[in-house]
């Protein structure tokens, strides 16, 4: 193939540079390697290492390469580019996309479905006329995948990793040998074999692993090997696994685009850490410090909320409804925080009914309702402005309106920073606007402030900005007040936002809200 072939796909899908670079690497790998079923993996590894020495080992029974891209850069779009490229230039028709959990599984299913907001193949002409057949963990037993092959269609299988390992033998007799066999490996009469074996027999099966760090040490690892794909493509923002308390990096990373690069290149929000001027955390008890951090988080939130409203009004774009993420220690702590922030003691009780608690203590209808509120937190009609969670937010929760994070869990500064900010880095308008209030994610961490600032001096740090409450942000909440212009009202019954300014121009008024009494 040629660079023109890569550019054809990249341009049609409007790929960002990191995505385009990844596609170029795949193009080169396929150019120098003979990737066929049953090929000598050791020989292929040596060939790839000759140009990409970072690949030390495939770590699987088949050639598998990891593309590490920071959160928010666009891993799902890159999956679409890989599939479009492999089909157009190499005739590949069988793909198996693996998700680590139900949330990502549902998201992938939606994004690979035509006429959806984030459809991954927008601009690919052949898929517009003849879209791929989407086979999922919910419909594979219908024989849809085999039918797609019969009509020479591209077949994209999307499975939650649990689906290829789950036995689900509840409906079988206790003495039925099939009870010990994963359901996907059981005979389907319409195709004459199990769907798993059907896939494993394909000469061109390519496996794409989303968030691949999540199933490197499970039964799913062996199951993927048993599929015997011709190629594995792994995507993750964290190319390492935790073993015995230590971080073990992947050995098959062929491309690494870390978060620091994404921040530098403007693909995500810029993180900032907040504190108060001349603040000494040692003067306060743990409870007092916690309340100060929550108070200041709301001050930042309300300032940000006003700024986002002003930006939307001035630019004629959608209004973004920001929210705060509070990371609690445990379920008891979470409940205490919610009770305090809904009480009259906290900003006169105006956040009552606007706080969502996400933890393992909820179940049934309440859990379903909370999950729905969490997944729709970007909706302007969703009242939630504060989310409290206890280690329950996993990959797949892709939101763009998180602007303030309050980490209350004990953590060292580096871990605190990197684990927290990943949740809120996606940009609401798809790119930076040039307005700091719109483009910045703020972490409220008075007690860890100096540690994080010291970390920020590291050239590889993710953080370069600081916010001082009482200086950069008012110590009381703010809101946008729309004042009717009487002249406009008389002439055309319109309203506009005005406020006196030193230059004589009119702009929105930002008014103070009484500060919480300590």
Language model features by range: what are they?
Residues 361-460, 464:
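Conserved RecA-like P-loop NTPase helicase motor core
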Residues 91-125, 160-163, 329-332:
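Conserved Walker A/P-loop ATP-binding site and its immediately adjacent core
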């Amino acid at each position: 193939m040629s660079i023109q072939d890569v550019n054809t796909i990249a341009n049609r899908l409007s790929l960002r540079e990191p995505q385009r670079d990844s596609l170029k690497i795949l193009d080169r790998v396929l150019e120098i390697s003979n990737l066929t079923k049953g090929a000598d993996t050791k020989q292929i590894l040596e060939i790839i290492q000759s140009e990409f020495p970072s690949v030390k080992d495939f770590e699987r029974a088949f050639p598998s390469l990891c593309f590490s891209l920071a959160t928010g850069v666009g891993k799902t779009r890159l999956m679409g580019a890989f599939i479009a490229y492999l089909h157009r230039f190499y005739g590949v028709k069988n793909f198996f996309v693996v998700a680590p959990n139900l949330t990502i599984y549902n998201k992938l299913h939606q994004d690979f479905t035509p006429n959806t907001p984030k459809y991954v193949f927008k601009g690919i002409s052949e898929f517009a006329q003849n879209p791929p057949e989407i086979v999922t963990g919910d419909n594979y037993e219908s024989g849809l995948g085999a039918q797609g092959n019969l009509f020479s269609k591209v077949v994209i299988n999307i499975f939650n990793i649990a689906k290829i390992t789950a036995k689900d033998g509840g409906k079988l007799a206790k003495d039925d040998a099939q009870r010990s066999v994963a359901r996907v490996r059981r005979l389907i009469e319409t195709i004459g074999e199990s769907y798993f074996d059907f896939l494993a027999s394909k000469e061109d099966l390519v496996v794409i692993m989303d968030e691949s760090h999540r199933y490197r040490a499970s039964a799913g690892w062996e199951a993927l090997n048993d599929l015997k794909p011709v190629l594995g493509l792994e995507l993750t923002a964290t190319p390492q696994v935790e073993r015995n308390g230590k971080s073990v990096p992947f050995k098959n990373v062929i491309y690494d685009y870390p978060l620091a690069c994404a921040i530098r290149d403007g693909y995500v929000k810029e993180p900032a850490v907040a504190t108060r001027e001349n603040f000494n955390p040692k003067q306060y008890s743990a409870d007092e410090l916690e309340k100060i951090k929550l108070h200041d988080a709301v001050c930042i939130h309300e300032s940000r909320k006003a700024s986002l409203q002003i930006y939307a009004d001035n630019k004629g774009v959608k209004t973004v409804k920001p929210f705060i993420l509070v990371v609690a220690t445990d379920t008891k702590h979470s409940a205490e925080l919610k009770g305090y922030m809904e009480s009259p003691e906290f900003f006169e009780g105006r956040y009552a009914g606007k706080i969502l608690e996400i933890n393992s203590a909820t179940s049934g209808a309440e859990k379903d309702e909370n999950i729905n509120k969490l997944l729709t937190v970007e909706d302007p009609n969703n009242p939630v402005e504060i989310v409290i969670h206890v280690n329950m937010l996993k990959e797949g929760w892709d939101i763009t309106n998180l602007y303030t994070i309050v980490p209350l869990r004990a953590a060292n500064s580096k871990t605190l920073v990197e684990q927290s900010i990943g949740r809120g880095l996606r940009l609401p308008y798809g790119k930076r606007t040039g307005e700091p209030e719109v483009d910045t994610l703020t972490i409220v961490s008075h007690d860890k402030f100096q540690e994080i600032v010291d970390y920020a001096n590291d050239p590889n740090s993710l953080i370069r900005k600081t916010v001082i409450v009482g200086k950069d942000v008012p110590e009381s909440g703010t809101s946008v007040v729309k004042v009717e212009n009487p002249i406009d009202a008389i002439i055309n019954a319109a309203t506009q936002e005005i406020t006196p300014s030193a230059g004589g121009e009119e702009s929105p008024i930002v008014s103070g809200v009484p500060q919480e009494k300590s």
